[in-house]
Regions:
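A short, proline-enriched helix->beta-strand linker immediately N-terminal to the Walker B motif
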Residues: 167-171
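A short, surface-exposed alpha-helical micro-motif characterized by mixed small hydrophobic
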Residues: 215-217
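Hydrophobic anchor residue at the start of the ABC signature
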Residues: 109, 162, 186, 190
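Conserved ABC ATPase "signature" region
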Residues: 71, 123-143, 252-253
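ABC ATPase "signature
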Residues: 233-234, 242
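Conserved ABC transporter NBD signature motif
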Residues: 59-71
């Protein structure tokens, strides 16, 4: 479904450094992949390339990114727009940034339908919005539909963004650190929603995170990035039990355990 080959991205403000340096991987239909690494490792830039969000005025890039054979780099913006929201959707880290603060959330959820299926009427469109909201774990749908973003909690806002991404039933969902700003309970709910969407709808998901424990809880395959490159790629269980790269080993060692928490408490006294 998705083929990334020798992707390299360099921002014009940093002409001597590649933000992404030779990234290649293949994703099959319905796969659930975790893309993990520290801040600045290139994972979000890779996601921007996959979703057709890179702009030539900001960066130069090489390689190919193909979704169902359609090139996502160096292609007509109308072609990219026809894929975004239909075959491909993105859930960003900060929902308050992704959502329009002066617009009720209902019409924002419906936006992909309005753009790509203008023939669908208001009643049917609202029905599709409610279905997507329910799939995203929202309740009291009529009330939420008519709220403004600032009237909802962080967890509910992220569910709204997931609903907006799901309404057109994309084949690939890129979730760019969707749980980072949430408390652990809400985080677990969002992860459960993503896993259910993958299982029930067959939606391929790329989960981007700096938290290896979160990615391991959700994904069957993990890709580890460091300094713009992929340093490890394989089944989650194998990587967690027998990592080969030193950076991956360091990420695993950084995962909190009860023993580490107790040790920190003792050291603080």
């Amino acid at each position: 479904m998705l083929d990334v080959k020798d992707l390299r991205v360099q921002f014009l403000e940093s002409p001597h450094k590649w933000a992404v340096d030779g990234v290649s991987f293949h994703m099959d239909e319905g796969e659930l992949i975790g893309l993990v690494g520290e801040s600045g490792c290139g994972k979000t830039v890779t996601a921007m390339a996959m979703s057709g969000l890179l702009k030539k005025k900001d960066c130069r890039y090489e390689g190919t990114v193909k979704l169902d054979g359609q090139e996502m780099l160096d292609t007509d913006r109308d072609n990219i727009r026809s894929l975004q929201g239909t075959k491909l959707a993105v859930v960003f880290q900060e929902p308050l940034t992704a959502l329009d603060p002066v617009m009720r959330v209902g019409p924002q959820i419906e936006e992909a339908i309005i753009v790509h299926h203008p023939e669908i009427g208001d009643v049917e469109r609202k029905k599709l919005a409610f279905e997507a909201m329910e799939n995203a774990g929202l309740y009291d749908l009529e009330t939420v539909y008519n709220k403004y973003p600032h009237q909802l909690s962080g967890g509910m806002l992220q569910r709204v963004c997931i609903a907006a991404a799901l309404i057109s039933k994309p084949r690939l969902l890129i979730a760019d650190e969707p749980t980072t700003a949430l408390d652990v309970t809400t985080q677990a709910h969002i992860l459960a929603i993503l896993k259910r969407i993958n299982k029930e709808q067959g939606t391929g998901i790329i989960m981007i995170s700096h938290n290896l424990a979160v990615v391991n809880a959700l994904c069957k395959r993990i890709i580890v990035m460091h300094k713009g490159r992929i340093v490890e790629d394989g089944p989650a269980e194998k990587i967690m039990k027998a990592p080969k790269d030193e950076y991956t080993k360091a990420l695993i060692a950084a995962i909190p355990t009860k023993e580490k928490v107790y040790r920190c408490k003792e050291d603080s006294y």
